Amino acid sequence: MIYRVIALVTLTHIGVALLVSRVARGFGVLPALGPGRWVVTFLVLDVVVLFAMLERRAPVFGQICWRGPADRAAVALTFDDGPNEPYTSRVLDALKHADVKATFFLLGANAERYPAVIRRVVDEGHELGNHTMDHEVLPLKGPGHIRSTIRAASDVIERAGGVRPRLFRAPHGWRNPWVDRIARDEGCEPVAWTLGVYDTDDPGSAAIGQRVVDGLSNGCIILLHDGRGLDDRPDVSQMIAALPGIIDQAKRRGYRFATVSRLLAGTDPR
């Protein structure tokens, strides 16, 4: 959807650029700046704005956390789009078996479906994060709607787990000038990620595992998915099958696992 909007905005800006050029020339304003230069100017602005919206680590809209300290052999596992049963419970089983703590960025709508799972996440020492209510494309929304979806998700998550989330991750990592500021106003620190392995493409458990292991580095925040937006019970078995091997290989390479908050704070992983 967002790519259609990008195309529409770009075509609109080209039309506006041509109109501005004609008006400017008609009134004798900046006569040397012809239609082509107006178009180029608007397109350059489009590129800058789109880069800021779609590049999760771009500082254009402010700084955002996307990795922990590089001087410590610690990493964080994060899971987006849950809870999604029975798969989130299977993720929790694997983490419990390996004695690893992780961070779950939850969708409010999914949290309403499976409140008991959120309680288990908290009881087993994992961290809760806010991933909005409905996984909408936030750059297409205004400040009021952004605040509403973040606050509503935090309310649902707190009711289910007894803990209000203190971290926020925008769906797809896409932001606009208001997203990070509003998230902080709502008590959530925005967090992106260091390593995404496109596990939602279902490339196979071996590929998912190898991509994670190959991309590991100190302070790495790993993005995986225990759900798929608001899809009803999407099958994420490939990711779950890869998870024990990911944890084992990371430990063999000397990495320890921490929740995102502990990783960013530089405190000892549990």
Name what the model sees in each region.
Residues 1-77, 84-97, 114, 119, ...:
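N-terminal pre-catalytic segment of deacetylase/amide-hydrolase enzymes
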Residues 51-141, 145-152, 156, 161, ...:
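Active-site beta->alpha N-cap acidic-glycine motif
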Residues 80, 95, 104, 128, ...:
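Divalent metal-coordination and catalytic microenvironments
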Residues 134-136, 197, 228-231:
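A short, flexible beta-alpha/helix-coil linker loop
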Residues 140-144, 202-204, 233-237:
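Short, solvent-exposed loop/turn segments at secondary-structure boundaries
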Residues 174, 180-216, 255-266:
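His/Asp/Glu-enriched short active-site or ligand-binding loop at hydrolase and phosphoryl-transfer sites
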